[in-house]
Amino acid sequence: MFPALQKIVVSTNASPLVGRELASNSTWIWHVERLPMLLGIPTVILSLTPAVLRLLIKPLLFVPIRYSSFVLTRLITPVLKEDMLEFESTADKKSPAGPKAKGKLALTSWLLSRYPASLKDRMSQLIRDYLAITFESTPSTSGVLFYILIELAAAPELAEAVRRELREVAPNGELPSTHLNELKVMDSVMRESARVNPFSHLVLYRKLLRPLKLEGCPELPAGCFICVDAHHIDFSPQLWENPERFDGLRHYRARQKPENGNRFKFANLGSDAPGWGDGPQACPGRMFADNTIKIILAHILTHYDLELPPGQGKPEKGSMPNGSMSPDTKAKVLFRSRKL
């Protein structure tokens, strides 16, 4: 299921970022969905290679990702040129720009208005920024969506509860962006899945630029890496009742209290939700990811029933050497079309 979800996420992300034409372009989708592996595999190989050999093999290992970057650059350049012409013809360069009629966000205008005047090659910088955004938004969103669907496939009654909410919020089958915040049951399922199946066991990596003394600890030297243990926050019995159990309505119930109306949301920051980071370094794309996942879930749950194959439980969780999630790419979920 995971490879199929990656294609869906790439296409859904691309529509508001680079336009619907590229969102349905098979070449764009093919290269974007491979970027994480084209970067990850050479990085792991280099980490296991003796330092004296790294300079020799590094150029060869990164040939595939350089080629994919070349292809993606060729595809996106005409889109960015059109965006730049539109930006230059706008009288007020600092005015916030909303989504265009064709559904594409004015991300280019937003970036251009914030680039320093001293920047000479704005096109090259735009391409780098767009490819970085495209790369960062693909594996994390796909992984989170993978585990949400696994949990829903294992709990058909929970999936039906989300469908009931969808029928109430979007009775005519239309779901405008203004209604996404009303999907409180869906949001609770998303947050609970992210708690039980976190994107990473370790978060907020920092490299110390000078020695640091923490209370109760020896002095940490400059150059040392520190991080936050997200795993023991997500599974803390002081924060969560029965933390080992997946409870899709856990956060929905918590939000029924008046004082919690704006708490316990999927995209919220806080000491009990370490996955997004915190402060000025918190994930800037978390609201975009929130909307993307809700749109995809709404479509899937409206049009399909899903369940795990007979005799198969939830797939085992894997993790990368850095603690990031590693979904089971061979896991299967059964989909059956629903009568609308």
UniProtKB/Swiss-Prot annotation:
Pathway assigned to this chain's UniProt record: Secondary metabolite biosynthesis
Residues modified by glycosylation: 25, 322
Segments traversing the membrane: 37-57
Binding site for heme: 283
Cofactor dependency: heme
UniProt keyword annotations, A-Z: Glycoprotein, Heme, Iron, Membrane, Metal-binding, Monooxygenase, Oxidoreductase, Transmembrane, Transmembrane helix
GO terms for MF: heme binding; iron ion binding; monooxygenase activity; oxidoreductase activity, acting on paired donors, with incorporation or reduction of molecular oxygen
Region Disordered, annotated ranges: 308-340
Cellular component terms per the entry's GO annotation: membrane
Cellular localization per UniProt: Membrane
Phenotype reported upon loss of the gene: Impairs the production of chaetoglobosin A but leads to the accumulation of prochaetoglobosin IV.
Coiled-coil ranges from the UniProt annotation: none
UniProt cross-references to InterPro entries, sorted A to Z: Cyt_P450, Cyt_P450_E_grp-IV, Cyt_P450_sf
Induction: Expression is positively regulated by the cluster-specific transcription factor cheR that binds directly to an asymmetric direct repeat present in the promoter.
GO biological process: secondary metabolic process
Enzyme Commission number(s) of this protein: 1.-.-.-
Topological category with respect to the lipid bilayer: Single-pass membrane protein
Principal cellular location given in the protein's record: membrane
Functional description taken from the UniProt entry: Cytochrome P450 monooxygenase; part of the gene cluster that mediates the biosynthesis of chaetoglobosin A which has a unique inhibitory activity against actin polymerization in mammalian cells. Chaetoglobosin A and its intermediates are involved in the morphological differentiation of C.globosum. The first step of the pathway is the synthesis of prochaetoglobosin I via condensation of one acetyl-CoA, 8 malonyl-CoA, and a L-tryptophan molecule by the PKS-NRPS hybrid synthetase cheA, followed by reduction of backbone double bond to install desired geometry by the enoyl reductase cheB.
Alphabetical list of PANTHER family matching this protein: CYTOCHROME P450, CYTOCHROME P450 MONOOXYGENASE AN1598-RELATED
Family listed: Belongs to the cytochrome P450 family.
Official protein name in the record: Cytochrome P450 monooxygenase cheG
